[in-house]
Every structure is written in structure tokens, then in C-alpha cells.
Amino acid sequence: LVVGAVIGGIVAMRVEMTGMPQLVAALHSFVGLAAVFIGINSDIVPPEGLAGAEKIIHEVEIFVGVFIGAITFTGSVVAYGKLSGVLDGKPLTLPGRNLLNVGMVLISLYLGYLYMGHAGSWTLWVMTAIAFIFGLHMVLAIGGADMPVVVSMLNSYSGWAAAATGFLLGNDLLIVTGALVGASGAILSYIMCKAMNRNFISVIFGGWGTTTGPQIEVEGEMIATDVTTVSSDLKEANDIIIVPGYGMAVAQAQSAVSELTRRLRGMGKQVRFAIHPVAGRLPGHMNVLLAEAKVPYDIVLEMDEINDDFPNTDTVI
């Protein structure tokens, strides 16, 4: 425990805020791998005295824990690769990918039936391999723009993996905390998909049920600007909304934005921040950056709180 805590503390302190999404994905992978190891260990060395219904329940706990854990592990590894730039952020679209996903799930369920029918541990090992491949394929098929949802989704999976492990070990605390993490991650993923006008099932299965429709024509005219023009607009504006995105994190510009906000407010102008649910690379990314730069919390608003104010705003950055 001490060694792990020290290593984790050192890694967390050395990681910059721009690398936090990758760290979160890596930590999710550890939870999934731990669930796989614990489940397989419990199969190799089962508790004594189990028979009848108790034995079947124990086998279900092993199977579910290993299945979710394996998906979480490989999915998180791919998410880490995409977020860090090691892997291409474009979705991998294999022919018949949806049928492939369904096939892997059905085969895993059949192997679970065989496993509980005392067919042997080989069914668990084969299912583990399939779940590893399923996790890889599922996240590889999701594009980089949906990565915030993927991180939240993997957070949910890691929670359910922990809960399944809690049932396996008879640990009530692990069950409760895992269920809380799993449920909150699932709800957050749904909220983020709704904010993106995306279908939740479509995102997590890498385009399930989506079709390519006619391209929407952009209305209006795009006008280029420069620093001088923006500075002049800000001086003349009384009501200003700043909408931060991942570019602020990459440029580490949160302190400069905070200083700009301080000066504008000192001139008597109203400055507020509008936070989109999927801004950045993980949930709450922009909120953490702005808090780090000491931007007042009361002017940082969620999309639903400020969306109706845009038509009456003088300038939006």
C-alpha cells in the first residue's frame, strides 16, 4: 500500500494538467486489470465449502468481474494511446464492426453458460481473450472528438468492475464505492452525449446505428479577426462570455485568461465563462484549469445556465 501510494503520488505530481486525461485513462486500466487478476485467481483457488447455488453465484461473480475488467483494461489502454497521440485519433471502421461486437458478446455469454456448466477453466480464459479484443475494438472504433465520453464511460466500467470484485471478495465497501462510480460515470456519459446531440449507444459502440446523411450547409459568413480587433471589441463591450476549450489547456493559457478576466472586470465589465460538458479531454477539465488559475467560481457557468444569454451578449471569445 505504501509503495503504491508513493508511486501514485509522484506520478500525479509530475503530470501536467494537459496530461491529466491520459493519467485518468491509465488508472482506469489498472482497475480493470486488477479485476481480471482477482477473478482468475479466485477461479484457480476457489473458496472451500461452496456447493449448489452458492457455487453458481460465485462463478457468475468471477465471470462478470473478469469480463468487465478485461474490457476496461484494453479499452483504457487504447484511450491512453489516443489521448497521448501514440495512436491515431481517427475511428477504426472495420467492415461489419457492429456484427463483430455482437458476435463477441454472444460468444462470451455462451462461454459463461459452459463455465457454469463445469466445462472447465478454459472457457474463462477464452472469454478473457475475447473481452480483451472487444475492449480494443470498441474504443478503436470511437473518434477522438468523443474521447471525453470514452473517459467517462471507462470510469463507469471501472466502477462496475470494482463492484463485481467486491461481490467476489465479500467486501461491502468495494461494492458500494464501485456501484457509485459505475452509476455516476454512466449518468455523466449520458449527459455529455445529450449535450453533443449524439446517441449514447452510437458513441460507445463506435457508430452503431448511424448513417451518413446529407451535409448541412453552413449559414452566414466567416470573418477573420486579429488581436487588435479583438482588443477593440473587448474595450467596447460591457457583457463578455469566454468559452474555453482544449486549446487553452494545450497552450497553458489559463493564467493569461484569468489575468484578462481580472482586468476586464476591473474596468466594470461583466465577464462570465461558459463551460460545455465535453470541453477538454475529460469531464470537468476546463473547471479544474480555471480554478487553478484562480478564476472566481461564481462566474464559471454550465451550458444550461448561460446558453440563453448569448443573443444578448456583446462579445464572445
What do the predicted segments below correspond to?
Residues 10-21, 36-53, 118-119:
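Transmembrane alpha-helix boundary signature
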Residues 218-316:
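Structured cytosolic domains appended to multi-pass membrane proteins
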Residues 57-67, 123-127, 169-185:
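Loop-to-transmembrane alpha-helix initiation sites
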Residues 143, 157-201:
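Mobile "lid/hinge" segments at catalytic clefts and subdomain interfaces of large enzymes
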